[in-house]
Swiss-Prot record:
Note in the entry: Binds to the phenylalkylamine calcium-ion antagonist emopamil, an anti-ischemic drug.
GO process annotations (BP): cholesterol biosynthetic process; hemopoiesis; ossification involved in bone maturation; sterol biosynthetic process
Localisation per UniProt entry: Endoplasmic reticulum membrane; Nucleus envelope; Cytoplasmic vesicle
Residue intervals of the EXPERA domain: 61-204
Listed name of the protein: 3-beta-hydroxysteroid-Delta(8),Delta(7)-isomerase
N-acetylthreonine, modified sites: T2
Amino acid sequence: MTTNTVPLHPYWPRHLKLDNFVPNDLPTSHILVGLFSISGGLIVITWLLSSRASVVPLGAGRRLALCWFAVCTFIHLVIEGWFSLYNGILLEDQAFLSQLWKEYSKGDSRYILSDSFVVCMETVTACLWGPLSLWVVIAFLRQQPFRFVLQLVVSMGQIYGDVLYFLTELHEGLQHGEIGHPVYFWFYFVFLNAVWLVIPSILVLDAIKHLTSAQSVLDSKVMKIKSKHN
């Protein structure tokens, strides 16, 4: 006589055997409030800092962009950095960030499975885009001449990683989450990651606009110098 056993975990595919899984002891609301509170605090601090610490006045749009990069610094360095270091013990670990990743994994179980792609992708993100996001903030506050180059590089890197993130899961048949679930699929998997396609795309166009304008000015000056010599 066979019996259907219900998996003792919330992850997909449902047949996954996760013997060392320890359920979160923090409510989902506490985890999400903690995450968004820290992010909100960083936005407020960066908004105020961009008004007082910048060597030249910055417009509202530029200050919002710096708030974005400040949040990216936190998420890439701290949250994704934690995953890069401790992905092998997430299932049984009860640290706040481990519980955050176990919660997010309800939308994409590749994270609690230490999938090769997500481990490598998140490690690159933590090591490169985290520090460089902080550098973008500093570069704009100090009006460093390469600031738009940094913005372009970081934003392109974020888009590239996000596109691969979606495409690899699509290639595997979206099997690591419950398709259509309003929270786990649409909010965790789709919305939270789509943000890293939309905002970086806007910032890529912004950087291209400023770099193109600067190149046009330089070309114009060079042409004037050449015309004088001729």
